[in-house]
Amino acid sequence: MKHTFSTALLVLLAAGMLRPAEASADDLSVTFREITGDVTATADGSLDLFGLVLSRAAPANPSGVAPGSGFFQVGSEMPVASSLYFTSVDGNGSGPLSFGTAETITNATSGTGDVFGITTMPTSFGIYVPLGYASGTSITSESLYAGKSFADLGITPGSYSWALGRNTVTLDVVSVPEPTAASCVLFIATVACGRRRRRRWAI
């Protein structure tokens, strides 16, 4: 019986129907959007803290961004206590050292949700998470930079990615075009056409 079970297991592995357990990994996505004269930042996902080193002191920072220094934090505009983890110096962290030019922090005008941020160190990367964060817990937050543009904040549009321990953190910097006059006219015409159709069906 044992021999039969082992043979069946090998067949499933060879067919790709059964795979050995792999180390867990988590992903978190951050998006900066420029739209209608403001910049918004959102963070969503979860993290696996395995292999990351907890710092003894985690400063309470408000949400902000300094792209030239490779720093951003999403969440409340007020200083919030957080836990700061570092990638170790043995190579379990990689990614861009900057995503723009401004090295001075610009704080968000408002924000809400869980703390999440990345800071670039000489030999490692730092990760800000909610105080007492447990691996796999959902992180959701947003911040607003009212009246700001990517140019004001020194952010370069594009897509950036960090490999931090078992985690992949992506940062997308995208501009959302404002609606043109032509698109507004088309929208109004579509709504008007729909109303006429409903009237015909009503008759």
Regions found by a protein language model. Name each.
Residues 15-22, 195-196:
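C-terminal segment of classical bacterial N-terminal signal peptides
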Residues 177-195:
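A short, hydrophobic C-terminal helix/tail in secreted or cell-surface proteins
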Residues 193-203:
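C-terminal membrane-anchoring or membrane-association module
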Residues 7-13, 185-189:
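Sec-dependent N-terminal signal peptides
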Residues 24-175:
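Mature extracellular "passenger" or substrate-interacting domains of secreted, surface-exposed proteins
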Residues 1-9, 180, 197-198:
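Bacterial N-terminal signal peptides that target proteins for export
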